[in-house]
Design a protein with these regions (language model features):
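Active-site loop segments of alpha/beta catalytic cores
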Residues: 1-49, 58-61, 67-69, 86-94, ...
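A contiguous, low-structure linker/loop signature
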Residues: 73-111
Length: 218
């Protein structure tokens, strides 16, 4: 696979990352930073199905639009067996649910293998290509986990999740721990494979977990 070339000002990148890191860690900053996504269609334009089935097209389009996001929300749910439906004009979405209700929780694996289960292998392939494209120098959002609850809604119906909070709080807590463990495991796999640069090929982890990537371009 060929190297995709980006013209990066590494001094400005370092300045931006330090400013954001200082701000989020309560250190003095010369001005308040903000992060943003560049809104662009990118050229050439490939639809969701083409990007999903041929990662080289996703990389080509993403580099054209830098922060154009790969919709990776289904990745973690797929590791638990959630079926993902790929279509042309929308991100993949989950067809059906693995669990009908919280009573079926024991059917769910207590631990997943993020490098091999579900779409985990695909995710690592995309990460390889992102590292080839940008060397970990800029954020490319390929793995937005949302939150443990958000992933849980892809495994069990949302209404039943809300009922379980009242009817079976202990089982619900265990469910959240299982899902959170899958998110942590995915992060650990990415860090093991890609080191410190992994923070630039995943999105912020979401509101349900304290760990977050704050070193991003501003």
């Amino acid at each position: 696979m060929g190297k995709y070339t980006l013209k990066l000002d590494k001094d400005r990148l370092a300045e931006s990352r330090k400013r954001v890191s200082d701000y989020y860690n309560g250190r003095p900053v010369d001005r308040i930073p903000f992060s943003f996504h560049i809104q662009t269609s990118g050229l050439p334009h490939y639809n969701y199905r083409q990007c999903n089935e041929d990662f080289s097209k996703f990389i080509e389009q993403t580099i054209a639009g830098v922060n154009a996001q790969f919709e990776g929300f289904p990745d973690t749910a797929s590791m638990f067996g959630a079926e993902q439906l790929v279509v042309d004009e929308n991100p993949p979405f989950t067809r059906g649910r693995v669990l009908n209700d919280i009573d079926g929780l024991d059917k769910l694996p207590a631990k997943v293998d993020p490098e091999n289960d579900g779409w985990g292998k695909r995710l690592m392939q995309v990460c390889d290509m992102c590292m080839d494209a940008a060397g970990g120098e800029i954020p490319i959002c390929v793995c937005d986990h949302q939150s443990p609850y958000g992933i849980a809604t892809k495994i069990m119906d949302n209404e039943n999740l809300m009922l379980a909070m009242y009817d079976a709080p202990e089982e619900m807590m265990r469910f959240m721990e299982i899902v959170t463990g899958a998110i942590d495991g995915t992060i650990a796999a990415m860090e093991r494979l890609y080191g410190a640069k992994a923070e630039h090929i995943r999105a912020a982890i979401g509101p349900g977990i304290s760990r977050c990537c704050f070193e991003t371009d501003a």
